[in-house]
A protein has these predicted regions:
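Eukaryotic scaffold repeat domains enriched in small/polar residues
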Residues: 21-228
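Sec-dependent N-terminal signal peptides
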Residues: 1-10
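Sec-dependent signal peptide cleavage junction
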Residues: 12-23
Length: 228
């Protein structure tokens, strides 16, 4: 279930209710990712499963969204949900299944991305595609420079963030890859992006669990700019 994520993603359609009136127990996560009791900010209107989304399409060879015969039809440890207002589209990190899902406003699957093509040496398979590994964060934005739609992904266990274009319902192409900065200013031993966003100038801001000095900032060309 992704009730907590949908509560945030569909906030505009939900109503604030008193804690005592909630038909369920609300929770949040502390620094150690342990669930702790919390007051509810919104009432959940709907919960959605992989079956509701139509994820069985991903294992149907006759479907244009076919990924593989054993593509999971269930969600696994979904970590992030982003709503693209310009295109009325939801994007989800189905983290445990190492993939990104694109959904319509009825939360039906319209795209599934397990990786991308492009120039990288990280997690590249025999087919030349680089695959995602436990992606935790996603952000989608249309560029003011070229009017293209870019998808920014915090590819956590591959120790990178990526910027991609969407080519079809199953294919992405790499535009820019962001890895651990090679500078003394970045003194953490690891680079483990968990959340990501971009501004109008296409600077990106990456939240890393191993960094406590702010988000890691890169410019449009992938150069480390410091912390924000």
């Amino acid at each position: 279930m992704i009730s907590a994520a949908l509560a945030a993603g569909l906030a505009l359609t939900m109503t604030v209710t008193a804690f005592a009136d909630e038909p369920y127990t609300a929770y949040n996560y502390d620094y150690w990712d342990d669930a702790i009791p919390s007051q509810s900010a919104y009432r959940v209107e709907k919960t959605v499963t992989g079956a509701d989304m139509g994820l069985d399409r991903l294992s149907d060879p006759s479907d244009p969204l076919y990924i593989s015969d054993d593509a999971p039809a269930k969600l696994s440890d979904a970590k992030d949900l982003f709503y693209d207002q310009d295109n009325d589209t939801f994007w989800m990190c189905d983290s445990g299944n190492n993939r990104i899902l694109r959904l319509d406003t009825d939360l039906k699957v319209t795209g599934c991305y397990t990786g991308f093509t492009g120039s990288t040496e990280i997690s590249v398979g025999e087919d030349g595609r680089s695959t995602f590994l436990n992606p935790n964060g996603i952000y989608v934005k249309k560029s003011i420079f070229d009017d293209k739609l870019y998808v920014y992904i915090a590819d956590t266990d591959n120790s990178r963030a990526v910027k991609c274009t969407v080519e079809s319902g199953t294919e992405m192409t790499l535009v820019q890859e962001y890895t651990k900065p090679d500078t003394k200013l970045y003194d953490s031993e690891t680079f483990n992006p968990s959340k990501i966003l971009a501004d109008k100038a296409e600077n990106i801001y990456v939240v890393c669990k191993s960094v406590n000095t702010g988000s890691v900032q890169f410019n449009k060309d992938g150069e480390f700019q410091g912390f924000y």
